């Protein structure tokens, strides 16, 4: 049986993001949210970190039902050229039972 996968991430927008119109930015973000929903994934936490670090604007946690959903979501990020607009870091993990 597959178990949930958690993606811990940090990010910041790159200059190309600010070259997009507000409508284009909103369209990309909407497609990301739709992809999460379609895969049964969700953002469980999204934090503004801009005030505490000069490297990242946000950090958060996404929960995916399985590793296949993570892989499909990453494919969506590539299709949307997310790496052109965002610099980030992420790590995947599973829940540690204590």
Where are these regions (language model features)?
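Conserved, mostly hydrophobic/aromatic
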Residues: 60
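Short, surface-exposed basic-aromatic patches at helix termini and helix-loop junctions that form
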Residues: 75-82
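Short S/T/G/P-rich N-terminal loop/turn motif that feeds into the first structured element of a domain
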Residues: 1-57, 65-71, 75, 93-98
């Amino acid at each position: 049986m597959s178990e949930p996968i958690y993606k811990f991430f940090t990010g910041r927008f790159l200059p190309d993001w600010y070259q997009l119109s507000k409508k284009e930015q909103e369209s990309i973000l909407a497609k990301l949210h739709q992809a999460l929903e379609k895969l049964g994934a969700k953002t469980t936490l999204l934090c503004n970190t801009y005030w505490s670090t000069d490297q990242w604007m946000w950090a958060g946690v996404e929960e995916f039902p399985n590793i296949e959903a993570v892989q499909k979501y990453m494919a969506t990020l590539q299709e949307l050229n997310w790496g052109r607009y965002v610099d980030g870091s992420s790590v995947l993990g599973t829940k540690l039972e204590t």
